[in-house]
């Protein structure tokens, strides 16, 4: 199988999600969208907020939750920290907020940076739950599908980073249960080790995210590249669902049986990756940058990041 192709396109999802914010910025000043304060917010403002949670700290420079530094609350920053600083790919010279713990893979429940990632993901999920619960939101199936995709992406990150997080799909005052409690294999009368509960949570979230993405994909926009002059620029389309499904299947060995070497879903990972590769999207390579930029020594990576 051409699994090397899969690796080549995964960085595109981060770029896509970052670009997704461009068309939503003007819609954030739409009044209060906190479900505990305003049960019927401006629909477009809340829809935009679901996208904004992928890249922004908050609407006005402050974070969406209590934190000493709003910049530490952003999703992209925290995803980078835990994906890269925990390896030999990157190192951070400062030590506040538990950054050093990430570098040494010694994070504890009290590690500040770990809590910031969890708070951000749960905040994003709450905004999506609020939007999806509104009767007025049901009228536009495409926007509804996009928010389902965004929520599924946040839960995918919960699955990937935490395994057995709290799980909730609605706006409620009830204390949410952890994901393992929703696995049909879970028996409340039985005794489990923490590792067993973790695996039950992973299995449940894997199947839930997969189903959500499959259902959302049907109503999402066609997989077509857009420019900033197009009305749908920055909106998640079918290709976003495909690449996330590919990523989900790629790690299914760990999510389903805690064995990264025994993955029954390699073919599905390849199938969805090739759907993106064979779509009208293309890698941003040397043929797509201005001649002047090439003459000055710029590479595609430099212009993107």
Which stretches of residues belong to each language-model region?
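Bacterial Sec-dependent N-terminal signal peptides
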Residues: 1-32
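Conserved, well-structured interaction surfaces
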Residues: 44, 48, 57, 91-165, ...
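Short coil/turn linking the two alpha-helices of tandem helical-hairpin repeats
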Residues: 159-161, 166, 251-260
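Acidic, serine/threonine/proline-rich low-complexity intrinsically disordered regions
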Residues: 171, 181-199, 243, 254-271
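Polar, glycine-rich mid-to-C-terminal structural blocks
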Residues: 253-254, 270-305
């Amino acid at each position: 199988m051409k699994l090397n192709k899969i690796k080549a396109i995964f960085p595109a999802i981060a770029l896509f999600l970052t670009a997704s914010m461009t068309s939503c910025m003007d819609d954030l000043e739409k009044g209060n969208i906190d479900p505990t304060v305003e049960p019927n917010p401006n629909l477009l403002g809340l829809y935009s907020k679901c996208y904004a949670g992928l890249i922004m700290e908050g609407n006005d420079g402050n974070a969406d939750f209590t934190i000493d530094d709003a910049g530490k609350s952003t999703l992209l920053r925290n995803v980078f920290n835990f994906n890269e600083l925990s390896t030999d790919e990157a190192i951070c010279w400062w030590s506040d907020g538990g950054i050093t713990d990430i570098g040494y893979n010694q994070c504890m429940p009290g590690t500040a940076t770990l809590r910031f990632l969890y708070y951000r993901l749960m905040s994003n999920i709450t905004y999506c739950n609020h939007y999806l619960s509104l009767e007025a939101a049901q009228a536009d199936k495409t926007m509804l599908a996009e928010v389902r995709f965004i929520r599924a992406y946040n839960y995918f990150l919960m699955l990937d980073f935490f395994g057995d997080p709290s799980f909730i799909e609605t706006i409620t005052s009830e204390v949410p249960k952890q994901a393992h409690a929703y696995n049909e294999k879970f028996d409340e009368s039985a005794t489990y080790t923490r590792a067993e509960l973790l695996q039950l949570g992973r299995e449940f979230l894997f199947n839930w995210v997969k189903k959500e993405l499959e259902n959302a994909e049907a109503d999402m926009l066609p997989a077509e590249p857009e420019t900033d002059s197009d009305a749908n620029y920055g909106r998640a389309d079918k290709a976003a669902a495909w690449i996330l499904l590919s990523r989900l299947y790629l790690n299914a060995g760990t999510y389903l049986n805690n064995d990264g070497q025994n993955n029954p879903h390699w073919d599905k990972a390849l199938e969805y990756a090739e759907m993106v590769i064979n779509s009208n999207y293309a890698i941003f390579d040397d043929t797509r940058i201005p001649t002047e930029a090439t003459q000055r020594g710029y590479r595609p990576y430099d212009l993107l990041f």
